[in-house]
Amino acid sequence: MIEILDPGYYITIQDMGRFGYSNYGVPQSGCMDIVSAKNANLLLSNSINEPLFEICMMGGKFLFKKEAKISLSGALFEVLLNDKGVSNDLLIEVNKGDVLSFGRAIKGNRIYLAVKGGIDCKSVMGSSSMYRCISEDFIVRKKDVFKFSQNPSNNLSHEKVCLLYTSPSPRDRQKSRMPSSA
């Protein structure tokens, strides 16, 4: 579980959005930076559509009431876990009682906080994305508590392996032609 100690400037829960309702005047909603949101979920082997926190521009403080695996992706923010700096695009293990704090955005506007398994929240019209007049809440508030999903949708297996093959760059070729000193 995660408790919101400080809701910052503007924090919401988002997923990839709701589709097929525009003819009824319902907007797609969903995360603003799709690539970063997908990346945050994929770092945890979550489905790309798992709900996650979208933190905009500055602020936010989260208390973990249970141990969890999390990831951050997107804009470069000042982020502290128990007063120690934390980087984006890594799997981070947090313990019960840990506090994750967001300062100001250094580069970009939005950072995504994903939790292994996703956040357990109500789905409206096929999406958990917060949006005014559609979801119960449109932003997270101080003292809100969110549970981790017990039944993550389409969780990816940790056993899958991705191999990355690279070609030598011109710089690598130049280095290999240099005479070796004997």
Language-model features, listed with the residues they occupy:
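Hydrophobic alpha-helical segments, chiefly the membrane-spanning helices
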Residues: M178-A182
